[in-house]
């Protein structure tokens, strides 16, 4: 597999100026070759959860990327301890009506449908816990690279709360892992490590932490079509007529 040397000056991230909508939880950056890097670092907490505000911001990011047309998108966590723990439990507990429950499910479902439908390659770089809505976000990406270390766990534990994966995991996980394995994970709520996730087909690669960045970037950059360079001016001008 091709890898990218992240010490190369050409791989330096170029920060993008904020759009009209300021982002509290996500940071979007662009690299010289057109790769976009989206970092989720939920403000004011030590763990990432997908609150209504965080999902709303993700939609704004997708709006922006629809305009800016990146060549590929890498999604990762800004937290040292994990990728995404899932939905915001406090918001789930505050739902008092059927309409409120439907709105919450629709918000996440529609957002991840948008992510799954983008026209450029997408990859989730997973280190640490990747649970519930976090795994559903990763499943909406085209590729997934997980870090092979004890803290990395993937699963859909919503069943412990009496709910099912409502943000797309219920249809995407069986496509990757097969119906028996997917049902086992969804009905028991158990989690798997990176190696087991790769064996099941949930992730594409399970790699050591030291090469996680190179592997993720290498997967995406190997998919990018070569850039077309303009021809030298001498080759684009019509030939001069021969002098008499």
Regions found by a protein language model. Give the residues of each.
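Conserved CoA-thioester-binding segment of acyl-CoA-metabolizing enzymes
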Residues: 2-76, 113
């Amino acid at each position: 597999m091709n890898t990218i040397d992240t010490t190369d000056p050409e791989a330096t991230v170029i920060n993008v100026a904020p759009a009209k909508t300021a982002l509290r939880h996500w940071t979007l950056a662009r690299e010289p070759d057109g790769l976009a890097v989206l970092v989720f670092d939920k403000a004011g907490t030590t763990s990432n959860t997908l609150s209504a505000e965080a999902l709303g911001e993700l939609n704004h990011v997708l709006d922006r990327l629809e305009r800016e047309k990146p060549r590929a998108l890498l999604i990762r966590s800004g937290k040292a301890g994990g990728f995404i723990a899932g939905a915001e439990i406090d918001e789930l507990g505050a739902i008092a009506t059927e309409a409120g429950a439907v709105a919450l499910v629709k918000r996440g479902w529609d957002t991840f449908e948008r992510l799954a439908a983008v026209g450029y390659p997408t990859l989730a770089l997973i280190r640490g816990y990747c649970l519930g809505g976090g795994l559903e976000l990763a499943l909406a990406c085209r590729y997934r690279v997980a870090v092979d270390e004890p803290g990395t766990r993937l699963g859909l534990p919503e069943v412990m709360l009496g709910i099912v994966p409502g943000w797309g995991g219920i249809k995407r996980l069986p496509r990757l892992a097969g119906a028996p394995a997917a049902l086992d994970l969804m009905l028991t709520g158990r989690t798997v490590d990176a190696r087991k996730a790769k064996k099941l087909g949930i992730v594409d690669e399970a790699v050591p932490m030291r090469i996680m960045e190179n592997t993720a970037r290498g997967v995406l950059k190997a998919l990018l079509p070569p850039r077309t360079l303009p021809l030298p001016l001498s080759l684009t001008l019509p030939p001069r007529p021969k002098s008499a």
